[in-house]
């Protein structure tokens, strides 16, 4: 949690905060993000153990991708298309799935004029390299519901 609260609706032209106090990822009306607080816990258990114990399995983590594109980008907090392409392709390869196999992508989707186009272009490049099909995969971001939960943003996306 942000304590003491030192942020709010503090829009400045050219910044990452929303002009109207709403977060609209991948939307032409999106003008930035809104920060919020949150917490999330994801309990992980090996699939074989969960099945053995009769647990309800909500999801399976089949693969991961992790990288840092360092100085080859606009700023420390701004991703590059090339770095995003590499990490998305890495995650698909690690999971053993093709982009065409997916029906939903939960994106970071901050609704910023810098971040969303980079993320969308990277996804488009990876998907287009695999298939010419269109309209089979939905793109979303939990930030449209709860804003950018800062340190809990990754957990919120996984939980969604």
Region locations from a protein language model:
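Condensing-enzyme catalytic core of the thiolase-fold
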Residues: 1-160
